Amino acid sequence: MADSSCSLPPLYENISYKSYILRAVDLTILGLLFSLLLHRILYMSQNGIIWLVAFLCESCFSFVWLLSTCTKWSPAETKPYPDRLDERVYDLPSVDMFVPTADPVREPPIMVVNTVLSLLAVNYPANKLACYVSDDGCSPLTYFSLKEASKFAKIWVPFCKKYNLKVRAPFRYFLNPFAATEGSEFSRDWEMTKREYEKLCRKVEDATGDSHLLGTDNELEAFSNTKPNDHSTIIKVVWENKGGVGDEKEVPHIVYISREKRPNYLHHYKAGAMNFLARVSGLMTNAPYMLNVDCDMYANEADVVRQAMCIFLQKSQNQNHCAFVQFPQEFYDSNTIKLTVIKSYMGRGIAGIQGPINVGSGCFHSRRVMYGLSPDELEDNGSLSSVATRELLAEDSLSSGFGNSKEMVTSVVEALQRKPNPQNILTNSIEAAQEVGHCDYESQTSWGKTIGWLYDSMSEDMNTSIGIHSRGWTSSYIAPDPPAFLGSMPPGGLEAMIQQRRWATGSIEVLFNKQSPLLGLFCRKLRFRQRVAYLCVSICVRSIPELIYCLLPAYCLLHNSALFPKGLCLGITMLLAGMHCLYTLWEFMCLGHSIQSWYVSQSFWRIVATSSWLFSIFDIILKLLGLSKNVFLVSKKTMPVETMSGSGIGPSQREDDGPNSGKTEFDGSLYFLPGTFIVLVNLAALVGVFVGLQRSSYSHGGGGSGLGEACACILVVMLFFPFLKGLFAKGKYGIPLSTLSKAGFLAVSFVVFSVGN
């Protein structure tokens, strides 16, 4: 409970950033884009179909820049003051922490364990925390790893709090070199903790290779004869905190759950798992706030829970309207700078409107909001209004919305009325929790429709976020230093493509479902610029113009026709390209990144736009035609590994270190066909200029191709440089012959068409 005294300093402040210079640059680039479009229109008749195609592509790029400028116009973020929490709040609220995982092969259990351990060790009373791990793969290995981790947690959690460690994920902490006086108490504790962690790693690794090492425990009988897509509900209380006083030696609750799955029932992927987590946690601990963290995103800031509570516990009108607190999704991999930079600027921009978008991890939710509550149904003090009490708490309304479980309905009423949750014995709730995990429990209810995480999209985070903002809620954005959560991304190649395809498919799905920001035009509670922001992050459909624009310079060189204006008007194009390059480079350098990182990022987004995003459009078309159903593809996760030494103290080795670090791995997947085709076409066009393969004449008055088109071809090849290297590399870093053959056939066809058309 919080002290409402107004004389005390606030728990947080909202910081707005205004840069009139950047706004001027954004508008200047937008003006240059419109000038180029106007020039295209005025001289369209003289240049024919090529300029029409270029005009359509550039119109799309201009629209995207307009959306981006509108989104970034008023950046903001929230700065919490967790040090003030103790003097303002004498009884901190409980928090339920969710860690979903789906595949023990693609999401290694030791990585899940590290995420769980980092959450258990945060600076927050242990009796106020509960960690729930949802295993959609129903893997006995995941349960075994979690059980072994609970034993190590009794060593790790006190060690972290005793020495106030900054990094509380063991695998990251022990990657750092040991620095302490030999023989000191810290040195002895460090060595002992290191040895125990190595034992944990070996147990998990050995059990991964030999299932017999999982043991013959009666608890594992529940996993017999189970399949990932066909099994009953399994709920195990791995560790129950019975101390109840929250001292530094206590370990929070740890609960393993795996919902029932049957082949003939939809399980709605991650969104379905999150809703099951909400129901089970509601029955067991019913904390007023919920944190969801992906299994590869560990807590990197020990005060992260306290920082979020600063937002929720500030007694103000704004506090009552804050639905969730989002921390940015950041990564420890060097190959993810391209994502971090975009999210830094776009995240702060959206935060300055109605609040950040839920990105699916590192997000603290209010349970009442996830249960469908709207701001209009609250009094100024945060309690339910009389009208809401009659409508929401009616027995018929509760059963039709939340299901027929009486225990579930009771927990919902307590959550909506903000009643304190007593310390219950977790095992007493297992039977009721298993009931709400049945495949058909959500049938004829509002779960996934207006309650919990919303269905009908693979991007359940964005879908749910739009639903929350459409009800009039706001959200808060906190970007602490160091980052609150850190994770890993696929190192490159196929896995990165798969992940980007899933994200793109989900974001496009949102445009065509009931939560579409386009439909939000009829919802006054979703602000106009917030709708623009959602459109901006959903605009992966620009992949088709991106692909066409990468081929236009080559076509114009081979066809001997002009793509860019001539004379003084060429200055518009040159100034536009130069300003855009310098502007994006400045964004990178302001965040401390290098020119090389900027170049890699530009290359990455061009490759993704013409491959993963392109396939996502086909996914959506097939889904809309009813010819296919989208499948949630789990990308493979990796983590740094240690070089174990005899003493347990020694240098560590990352699995991505070495001469091949940063190289793209290729295989015969269709993901690599567009990029290979683009490189071959542009190389053929450049070679064609020197060997006289160009058409000898042109039919329009706009003139023939020239230096501008040749430079554009060179730029495209540079942006697709990983594919250029792949043409000459061998092994997994070389493009397979099957892909080269397909791309070569398409490239030859393109050249023949361009020259002969």
Curated annotation (Swiss-Prot):
<keyword id="KW-0812">Transmembrane</keyword>
<keyword id="KW-0808">Transferase</keyword>
<keyword id="KW-0333">Golgi apparatus</keyword>
<feature type="active site">
    <location>
        <position position="136"/>
    </location>
</feature>
<comment type="function">
    <text>Thought to be a Golgi-localized beta-glycan synthase that polymerize the backbones of noncellulosic polysaccharides (hemicelluloses) of plant cell wall.</text>
</comment>
<feature type="transmembrane region" description="Helical">
    <location>
        <begin position="568"/>
        <end position="588"/>
    </location>
</feature>
<dbReference type="InterPro" id="IPR005150">
    <property type="entry name" value="Cellulose_synth"/>
</dbReference>
<dbReference type="GO" id="GO:0016760">
    <property type="term" value="F:cellulose synthase (UDP-forming) activity"/>
</dbReference>
<feature type="transmembrane region" description="Helical">
    <location>
        <begin position="672"/>
        <end position="692"/>
    </location>
</feature>
<dbReference type="GO" id="GO:0071555">
    <property type="term" value="P:cell wall organization"/>
</dbReference>
<dbReference type="InterPro" id="IPR029044">
    <property type="entry name" value="Nucleotide-diphossugar_trans"/>
</dbReference>
<keyword id="KW-0961">Cell wall biogenesis/degradation</keyword>
<feature type="transmembrane region" description="Helical">
    <location>
        <begin position="735"/>
        <end position="755"/>
    </location>
</feature>
<keyword id="KW-0472">Membrane</keyword>
<keyword id="KW-0328">Glycosyltransferase</keyword>
<feature type="transmembrane region" description="Helical">
    <location>
        <begin position="48"/>
        <end position="68"/>
    </location>
</feature>
<feature type="transmembrane region" description="Helical">
    <location>
        <begin position="533"/>
        <end position="555"/>
    </location>
</feature>
<protein>
    <recommendedName>
        <fullName>Cellulose synthase-like protein B2</fullName>
        <ecNumber>2.4.1.-</ecNumber>
    </recommendedName>
</protein>
<dbReference type="GO" id="GO:0000139">
    <property type="term" value="C:Golgi membrane"/>
</dbReference>
<dbReference type="Pfam" id="PF03552">
    <property type="entry name" value="Cellulose_synt"/>
</dbReference>
<dbReference type="GO" id="GO:0030244">
    <property type="term" value="P:cellulose biosynthetic process"/>
</dbReference>
<feature type="transmembrane region" description="Helical">
    <location>
        <begin position="607"/>
        <end position="627"/>
    </location>
</feature>
<feature type="active site">
    <location>
        <position position="461"/>
    </location>
</feature>
<comment type="similarity">
    <text>Belongs to the glycosyltransferase 2 family. Plant cellulose synthase-like B subfamily.</text>
</comment>
<feature type="transmembrane region" description="Helical">
    <location>
        <begin position="24"/>
        <end position="44"/>
    </location>
</feature>
<feature type="transmembrane region" description="Helical">
    <location>
        <begin position="704"/>
        <end position="724"/>
    </location>
</feature>
<keyword id="KW-1133">Transmembrane helix</keyword>
